[in-house]
Amino acid sequence: DITRELVQECLYEHNSGVFILPAPIRPTDWRNVHAGHIERIIGILTQTYDYVILDTPGTFNDIVARALELASMVVLLATVDMASLKDTLLAIDMLRSWNFPQEKIKLVINATNDAHNVQPQEIKRMLGRDVFWSIPYDRNISAATQLGMPVVVSKPTAKASESIVEMAYAISGVR
């Protein structure tokens, strides 16, 4: 049985003050997890925290579907390369086929720079939706990833960090 106490025991507090419920260490540990478990965990977390952010895999299954159903907002992250945009279009089409409320989806483009020459209007035309936010390309992201730290912690003044913080304010409605 999944209890509040069990969920709290499984949380890890990052030194930034954010609580994280890490994924199982071994992929085989997911075999016994089902959508009802995710629903219960999300329910417990939403009673305890103001914001619950789920980093789901890029595949659709019953667990991801249930998490999406429970979400008040879905941030769909893409890059401007054609493979990513194609996958993003497939994800949008899949969600549309599930009658998922399209107003819940916020499209975020990651690692934008002038070299890509893909403008937000072109992305809107390709994907059929506005770009909610664009995070600029920043080499500090790769360095932060190698350190195992969020870029907003390792380099808070980096362009990407500032953009991510502003996006968080825009999403939360705070400020």
Task: Outline where the language-model segments fall.
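Phosphate-binding loop that captures ATP/GTP phosphates
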Residues: D1-I20
